[in-house]
Amino acid sequence: MLKIKWLIWGLLPPILGFGQSYKEAPETLRLDTNYSYFQFFTKEAATNFYNAFHKERPNRTSIFHFGASHVQAEVMVTEAREALQNEFGNAGRGLVFNYGAANTYSSINYNSTKQGTWTFAKSFMRNPSLPLGVMGMTVQSEEVGASLIWDFKKPISSARHRIRMFANNDENTPDFDVIINDQTIPFDREHRFRFYGLPYFEIDYEGEVKSLRINLVASGASGTQFTFYGVDFQNQVGGGLVYHSLGVGAAPMESVIRLDAMPEQAKVLNPDVVFLDFGTNNILYTNTLDSNIKTAVSKAITFFRSINPEVVIVLTTTQDLYYKGKVITAGVAFRDLMQDLARAHNCVFWNWFDQSGGLNSIRQWGNDGYAQKDHIHLTWKGYRLKGQFVHKSVMNTLKYIEQNPNAETLVISSKSYEFTEPTPSEIQKSKPSSKKYHTVKSGESLWSISKKYGSSVEKIQKMNGLRSTLIKPGQKLRIR
């Protein structure tokens, strides 16, 4: 049986209204908008948060949002990005990656494909074979004619773009062409030398961007190894906000300190706000707190403050999780740990756990169509709803600081839960009655298969002992 002890906290300004999607969310989700704030524990943290976002800010705001699969697909991030850019101005699309070359699912905003042979590494790998950059993935090719291709489902809006391609630039780097829409920009040895010593190649381009392609070309005067970390689209001038989606499916908290190539890249991108939005892959399989979490958070905070001493570090919670017939009660302990670390390191804290219904709520989200059948990942409308809460939590916090300019803290007491595990018979009823298999068809990916069965890429990988997302037609996969 579940009991919630409600705790009383100080008066806060009224919650701002949500859009139509929020109004349509059923009461059974147990949403609690009292937690729609970014909590802070010192006056300094409040000042830094306000300075990062307020509309009179002279410089653009740069947001890094690290996380796992819920960030990689960009449903939540897209919702938050568009709403925040409507408030503060659009400084550009931000970073994109070629997920096709990394053999994984792409963002909802673009198709990313490749030609030729590419090797890849990802931040959830314990010993990645390539250096990792800020996006948590790296791809590399030594094949003449190999290509990275992007087709944007909605063109990147017309502007004076500064396009930066983060890639190695040394004696091993081959010549390559960049094709934006139908315009080709060659990067031969002379052109590449202009950017020698920098972690990127740069193009200024005016107009909308419908497609982008990088082609490796043959040249006797260049190398053969192209190592790629991501492409950044920002406006050449003006303020506004840029929101970088830096998700890697299956990544745990400690993945963020495995990004060896990130320091140089982060200095260029200069983050003002950094979300460390992990946890699911730390607690899901063991229902305990991982001993690596504290160390990873501390190292990440130290690193980002070395780049920007006033950076706002956002520590978040997981949502409620249900796995193999059991409620993952460690979500409560993870919430408490993130709040304690936020207080200890002068960060801000976003309590999505209590905001989204708290312990033992995810199955109701599934019943209402806001969570997938695996009771780990949300559906499209579930992630959209979460993105709306990110936006409104920012606006509510700014309003609170404006109305309480001398406030040194904004702390909302977390909910307390008493939970009794289901009986063995109840657990048995919740499990599938038999194993299920799927035979891979031509053109299918782990992502499309996981969506078909309401599962996840990571779950299918684990169930079948797959070390990568590479599959082939005729392969038999266990689905449950």
Give residue ranges: language-model regions.
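N-terminal secretory targeting modules
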Residues: M1-I4, W9, G17-F66, H70-V242, ...
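Alpha-helical scaffolding within the catalytic cores
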Residues: Q39-H54, S255-K267, T295-F303, V332-D336
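Structural recognition of the beta-strand scaffold that forms the well-ordered cores
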Residues: S62-F66, A73, G92-F97, V242-G247, ...
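Oxyanion-hole/transition-state-stabilizing segment in secreted/luminal serine hydrolases
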Residues: M135-E143, I257-N292
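Serine-dependent acyl-ester chemistry module
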Residues: G238-V242, V248-M253, T280-S291, T318-A333
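Active-site segments of SGNH/GDSL-like serine hydrolases
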Residues: F275-N281, T302-R335, A344, N351
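Catalytic His-Asp segment of secreted/periplasmic serine-dependent ester chemistry enzymes
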Residues: L321-T420, I427
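Primarily a LysM-type cell-wall glycan-binding module
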Residues: P422-K462, R467-I479
